[in-house]
């Protein structure tokens, strides 16, 4: 074997558990658009998508055209929505690969309409309404005029209407008030579309947080992302979701050494042993996605015990203080993210807090040089 012992295990049984939790939470008859953009948040979107397809997922959400084409070329035939829309010159491929796209301007709509007409097809679009995110979308105040103009474009199929919450993961009074405001603006935009004679198949604004925390009776689709991969949308949801982490980043100890008091560890000598310590060298580093900001902050699990990361995180290595770990030896398994076989875990939420970021970035940061190994695929998936 030519590779290191550093791998990312992805437990598809845990994915199924999290998906079922979403199914049990949302209203009966509500569809699920699984967000698999950014390589399924670093988990490997081809294997994740195939597993979700066997579970009956309604649709998939990707960030841009190339991701949608990859799904189609792999045999995925469920609806695929390009959440970030298409760029000039991509319209024909979007239509040709039978992909749906978010639409956030009338100019974009006209170009898509022209491309679809030239192919003797209809482009499937989801009109994106900016209800307060301030990123992409038709301003909610202009929704009525937009839908009125859209009626003139005969090669577009308004398959859906979409918006995005800015703070659904904030459950304090201010966060809830703003989410309610966005929901009311979105409901008004949907009503404007129906007033112009449109009957969109999908109406959706709920991300992971809103799917679990809000009542949106006028919507019929939710867009879970982070919860499928086993992490909370925010700390406000602590204890509210029985999620299972689906990724385990693991490695093993390559070297053990006793160091004397005053010995410094790693670049810039940011850790100095206060007394005699046993230090383990582990072949994983920031090139693998183990952030340099975890220097002297991170913790790993060895033989069921937490061990602190000591010294600067290197490109290919970290060091951990295992003085207190009884029986530790070279070759022992190290869990950097996720849970070991006995259920001792380092949660993505913890890593994110130590690194000053969010679980999304932790997952997406696990680099391509870390092999993904998929465990417990469904029988149909095999």
Curated annotation (Swiss-Prot):
It catalyses: L-alanine = D-alanine. The active site is at residues 37, 267. It comes from the Bacteria. The gene is alr. This is Alanine racemase. Catalyzes the interconversion of L-alanine and D-alanine. May also act on other amino acids. CDD domains: PLPDE_III_AR. Pathway: Amino-acid biosynthesis; D-alanine biosynthesis; D-alanine from L-alanine: step 1/1. GO terms for cellular component: cytosol. The keyword Kinase does not apply. Belongs to the alanine racemase family. Substrate binds at residues 135, 315. Keywords: Isomerase, Pyridoxal phosphate. It comes from Geobacter sulfurreducens (strain ATCC 51573 / DSM 12127 / PCA). Its EC number is 5.1.1.1.
